[in-house]
Amino acid sequence: MSIETLLEAARFLEWQAQQQQRAREEQERLRLEQEREQEQKKANSLARLAHTLPVEEPRMEAPPLPLSPPAPPPAPPPPLATPAPLTVIPIPVVTNSPQPLPPPPPLPAAAQPLPLAPRQPALVGAPGLSIKEPAPLPSRPQVPTPAPLLPDSKATIPPNGSPKPLQPLPTPVLTIAPHPGVQPQLAPQQPPPPTLGTLKLAPAEEVKSSEQKKRPGGIGTREVHNKLEKNRRAHLKECFETLKRNIPNVDDKKTSNLSVLRTALRYIQSLKRKEKEYEHEMERLAREKIATQQRLAELKHELSQWMDVLEIDRVLRQTGQPEDDQASTSTASEGEDNIDEDMEEDRAGLGPPKLSHRPQPELLKSTLPPPSTTPAPLPPHPHPHPHSVALPPAHLPVQQQQPQQKTPLPAPPPPPAAPAQTLVPAPAHLVATAGGGSTVIAHTATTHASVIQTVNHVLQGPGGKHIAHIAPSAPSPAVQLAPATPPIGHITVHPATLNHVAHLGSQLPLYPQPVAVSHIAHTLSHQQVNGTAGLGPPATVMAKPAVGAQVVHHPQLVGQTVLNPVTMVTMPSFPVSTLKLA
């Protein structure tokens, strides 16, 4: 329930009180009117009983009265006895006045001579008539007092001076004169002779009473009012019942409307207080929500930054790993960071499973380093030029390679029992190539734990793109130039001497054209030379001499040897290599 409903209920109560007051006033008026009507009915009934028979006569005798002015002089003394009939005259007029009004106009002059004769012979009638000529004027105002005849009285009031409407009054006097007993009863009911002022006030009261009676509904307004009052009270009761149901903790014993309204006001005030509290709570929660959203955004931003860092680390690790695991033609970035030794050892440990994929040449070389056993796989690869052979020994464990290579170091070079078909041309290094250009990248191993990475970027035009890694070499270095056909090949051997390397070059497996191989050698006491086939005329040789410098002399090779940890030999046809110490 809202305040508007309570205000409406209060207005309704006020309106109800006003209606009750009006009803009381109206009942008083109706009671007074009923009393007046009863008095008038009594007077009318008495007049009718006394004058039922002579009512017809006045119509014939009414016109002669105005012609009686000559009669007053002979009867001056009897005016004292006549006043009694004067007071009685107006009462019968009230009932008979409507009847004589229409007839008087047609009978003014016709009866003038006739009634005068019979009136004069009357003994008592003549003087009575002469006195009543002036008397009817003051007695006439009493006619308007009765309420039921108000419309007729209005019509008769304006012609107060005319004698025609007043003519019927004297006729009853003649009939009442022989009955003096009735006159005293009627006289006390009549008020004193009215004056002109009372004549003016009486019509106004009659108009009001007539308007009240003429209103639509009349007496039926009371029934309508009662129905409306019942409906109003039923509606009000229903409203209070609804209010009771909506208000909690209402005491059933207190059934008064006032208590219900007070309880409703208190409940409304409590609801308003709760509403304000809830609004404050909503504002606080909104502020907390905004703060939480800001914090969440900050955490998301921080998380995205961490994800970026982790992604960068992952990419760096992937790019930093040697690309021997998967074949690709992509160019490595220059100046790339060195890889930790732990990662290198892990990579070295991955070598044995990969050896299983390359069955015959690699296994033979890992287990049987002497050259006498290696020529076995020659039959499967008889053709020299279409493919270049490469063996990735970097995958082999260091422990296996060390003992195997320490023993063959003093051994003499084995006889070239199985000369490779790729060794035929003389002008080439150790093995001639049919055609095409490439670069030669040499890898040497040493007992040093660290790794020196050399990144060599070569444009794809003359040859393939290769990444070379050079590590410090052992005391007995060896340099190998491996030939290949236009497809880029990678050759890895473990020779004790150059002849041994040349002899093994013909037995190495082949790689397809787009392959670029990079290796990191993890050996402590053996020599490793990795050669990548390239163009016939140009070649790049990288070596690390420890005890004595050794240079491979060839008419097509330009070499530089320096007693430094790293020796870089460049060819004029390729870009300069970049070396980094790990």
Curated annotation (Swiss-Prot):
Listed Low complexity bias regions: 109-123, 387-408
Full protein name: Max-binding protein MNT
GO terms for MF: chromatin binding; DNA-binding transcription factor activity; DNA-binding transcription factor activity, RNA polymerase II-specific; DNA-binding transcription repressor activity, RNA polymerase II-specific; identical protein binding; protein dimerization activity; RNA polymerase II cis-regulatory region sequence-specific DNA binding; RNA polymerase II transcription regulatory region sequence-specific DNA binding
Biased composition (Acidic residues): 334-345
Subcellular location: Nucleus
GO-annotated cellular components: chromatin; nucleoplasm
Renumbered residue ranges of the record's region Disordered: 18-224, 319-422
Domain bHLH: 220-271
Pfam families: HLH
Transcription found in the keyword field: yes
Record function comment: Binds DNA as a heterodimer with MAX and represses transcription. Binds to the canonical E box sequence 5'-CACGTG-3' and, with higher affinity, to 5'-CACGCG-3'.
Positions bearing N-acetylserine: S2
Biased composition (Basic and acidic residues): 22-42, 203-214
Region feature (Leucine-zipper): 271-299
Assembly behavior: Efficient DNA binding requires dimerization with another bHLH protein. Binds DNA as a homodimer or a heterodimer with MAX.
Biological processes annotated in GO: cellular senescence; negative regulation of apoptotic signaling pathway; negative regulation of transcription by RNA polymerase II; regulation of cell cycle; regulation of transcription by RNA polymerase II; transcription by RNA polymerase II
Keywords per UniProt: Acetylation, DNA-binding, Nucleus, Repressor, Transcription, Transcription regulation
